């Protein structure tokens, strides 16, 4: 364990899920180094623990290849400013949390300046653009992976990697309490609810709010007594979703909640959601789900040429087989979504729940503590390439 009186960590988290991971890692590091300083880009959870943000996290919350291109000048400015600030700071370690297209380039520059670098959350190199592993090898001293199959990929390419498990698997109980979640959200204890999660980013809602709202109308025809509840990450996303609801289903009642996505999923009987980290959360909460996603046509065509896998959602990737339905791009239509939700709500969920329980146990490793131990071991290491 490092003997320095004050360790300094530079960190960059690119979105909500990164803020959660960053806060967990900070809390674990603060157990042994209560005076540690944390600087870079973080969200509200990290800032609540004393993180010093040089830029707002929203600057990095961009989805899709085409969408990134439109913001490229600003992103490059942010990165060059960070390189200057962090190089002057000379931290004991830089930790890039997810956001690989931004962070790996940053890590490459910082490592060249003699700063130890960690990338927390492996990019999906096993799924698409596998040659990125060579850049990752040059950019980082260590990768912290959340998923067990990722470490095998890094070991094969002789890139230092530690499997730490997933903080969500640590945080979410093995059996979630539907009744308590409904009480907290003031939902009817006896009604059937479908949770609708169209994503946390503006670009996601732009693509998904309309098909999700239209699908809800069709689902209401199949299940007249069903109710809908939607968590929105902030007021801006709520307004965006309300606009879609007003335009496409003005008479449909959807109960909206700011934040509390985990509680909303726990309160629900089924979940319709965007592909991403939320699918892992839904799996750990153990509810029937339908995963859907859509990006701009150009982004999709570019991504399709680089894909190495034919599954997208984390439950299916972890299981190594199709356990939840995925409706991607051209299949992300109101009709197909509604049909898939109908099937999931009517089927025997017991075998799928058993698989979710197995995967939950596999990922439950006290991730933040393991990540902190790996980072501190790197800080203490003398001979690091």
Swiss-Prot record:
One of its GO terms (biological process) is lipid A biosynthetic process. It is an enzyme of class 2 (transferase). GO terms for cellular component: membrane. The keyword Calcium does not apply. Keywords: Glycosyltransferase, Lipid A biosynthesis, Lipid biosynthesis, Lipid metabolism, Transferase. Pathway: Bacterial outer membrane biogenesis; LPS lipid A biosynthesis. CDD domains: Glycosyltransferase_GTB-type. One of its GO terms (molecular function) is phospholipid binding. The keyword Mitochondrion does not apply. It holds the Pfam family LpxB. It catalyses: a lipid X + a UDP-2-N,3-O-bis[(3R)-3-hydroxyacyl]-alpha-D-glucosamine = a lipid A disaccharide + UDP + H(+). It comes from the Bacteria. Signal peptide: none annotated. Its EC number is 2.4.1.182. InterPro entries: Glyco_trans_19. Belongs to the LpxB family. Condensation of UDP-2,3-diacylglucosamine and 2,3-diacylglucosamine-1-phosphate to form lipid A disaccharide, a precursor of lipid A, a phosphorylated glycolipid that anchors the lipopolysaccharide to the outer membrane of the cell. This is Lipid-A-disaccharide synthase. It comes from Shewanella sp. (strain MR-4).
């Amino acid at each position: 364990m490092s003997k320095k009186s004050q360790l300094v960590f530079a960190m960059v988290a690119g979105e909500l899920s990164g803020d959660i991971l960053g806060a967990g890692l900070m809390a674990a590091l603060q157990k042994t180094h209560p005076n540690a300083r944390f600087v870079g880009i973080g969200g509200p959870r990290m800032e609540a623990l004393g993180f010093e943000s040089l830029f707002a996290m929203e600057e990095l919350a961009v989805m899709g290849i085409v969408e990134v291109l439109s913001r490229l000048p600003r992103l490059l400015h942010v990165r060059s400013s960070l390189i200057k600030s962090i190089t002057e700071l000379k931290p004991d370690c830089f930790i890039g949390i997810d956001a690989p297209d931004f962070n790996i380039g940053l890590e490459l520059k910082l490592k060249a300046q003699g700063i130890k670098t960690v990338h927390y959350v492996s990019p999906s190199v096993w799924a698409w653009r596998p040659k990125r592993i060579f850049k990752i090898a040059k950019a980082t001293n260590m990768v912290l992976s959340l998923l067990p199959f990722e470490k095998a990929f890094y070991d094969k390419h002789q890139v230092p990697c530690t499997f730490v498990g997933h903080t969500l698997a640590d945080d979410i109980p093995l059996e979630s309490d539907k009744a308590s979640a409904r009480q907290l959200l003031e939902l009817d204890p006896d009604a059937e609810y479908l949770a609708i999660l169209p994503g946390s980013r503006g670009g996601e809602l732009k693509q998904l709010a309309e098909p999700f709202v239209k699908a809800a109308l069709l689902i209401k025809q199949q299940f007249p007594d069903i109710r809908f509840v939607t968590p929105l990450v902030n007021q801006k996303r709520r307004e965006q979703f309300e606009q879609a609801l007003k335009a496409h289903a003005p008479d449909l009642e959807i109960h909206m909640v700011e934040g509390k996505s985990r509680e909303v999923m726990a309160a629900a009987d089924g979940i319709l959601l965007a592909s991403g980290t939320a699918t892992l959360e839904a799996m750990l909460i153990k509810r029937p789900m339908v995963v859907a996603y859509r990006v701009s046509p150009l982004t999709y065509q570019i991504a399709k040429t680089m894909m190495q896998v034919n599954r997208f959602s984390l439950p299916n990737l972890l299981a190594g087989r199709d356990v939840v339905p995925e409706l991607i791009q051209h299949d992300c239509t109101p009709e197909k979504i509604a049909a898939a939700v109908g099937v999931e709500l009517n089927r025997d969920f017991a075998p799928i729940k058993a698989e979710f329980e197995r995967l939950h146990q596999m990922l439950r490793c006290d991730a933040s503590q393991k990540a902190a131990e790996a980072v501190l071991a790197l800080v203490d290491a003398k001979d690091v390439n």
